[in-house]
Amino acid sequence: MAEKRNIFLIGPMGAGKSTIGRHLADELHLEFYDSDQEIEKRTGADIAWIFDLEGEEGFRAREETVINDLTDKQGIVLATGGGSVVSKAVRNRLSARGIVVYLQTTIDKQVARTQRDKRRPLLQKDDPETVLRRLAEERNPMYEDAADYIVDTDEQSARAVANQIIEKINQ
């Protein structure tokens, strides 16, 4: 039997990785995983609490372990955390073990999509837009470098983006 392909979704918070990933997995009959949800499941704690207790460095170490474990599976769609690409080891692992799709979005869309979400520790500041701009400057080159495909998520439904990804990977 042919080996099933893995699809890994990367991009900033608010790009739609989890929502699009569920649609993609459903359409392709693959298992869906969200690295943040998997971390919460394994630790029994939410991301914000892990950040408070262990700092970003402790969280990133957990994230790297979870992504390593999940990318060893076959036939999955994985929505990664927005900061996972900061780790060169994670970027290399994603590239080596599947198809990497960068879900691109604007800062304005990120602000609109994340403004009521209290589960995002990096945005619990007075000026989340400034934080998002700084993160974009830092991470966008890493997303681009790791990506096999880049898909814009701003003006399309999650289902339309999932279908666009399927078209791209089947070309």
From Swiss-Prot:
It is an enzyme of class 2 (transferase). One of its GO terms (cellular component) is cytosol. Its main location: cytoplasm. GO terms for molecular function: ATP binding; magnesium ion binding; shikimate kinase activity. It catalyses: shikimate + ATP = 3-phosphoshikimate + ADP + H(+). GO terms for biological process: amino acid biosynthetic process; aromatic amino acid family biosynthetic process; chorismate biosynthetic process. Mg(2+) binds at residue 18. ATP binds at residues 14-19, 120, 156. Binds 1 Mg(2+) ion per subunit. It holds the Pfam family SKI. Its EC number is 2.7.1.71. Its cofactor is Mg(2+). Signal peptide: none annotated. It is found in: Cytoplasm. Substrate binds at residues 36, 60, 82, 139. Monomer. NCBIfam families: PRK05057.1. Belongs to the shikimate kinase family. PANTHER family: SHIKIMATE KINASE, SHIKIMATE KINASE 1, CHLOROPLASTIC. Catalyzes the specific phosphorylation of the 3-hydroxyl group of shikimic acid using ATP as a cosubstrate. This is Shikimate kinase. The gene is aroK.
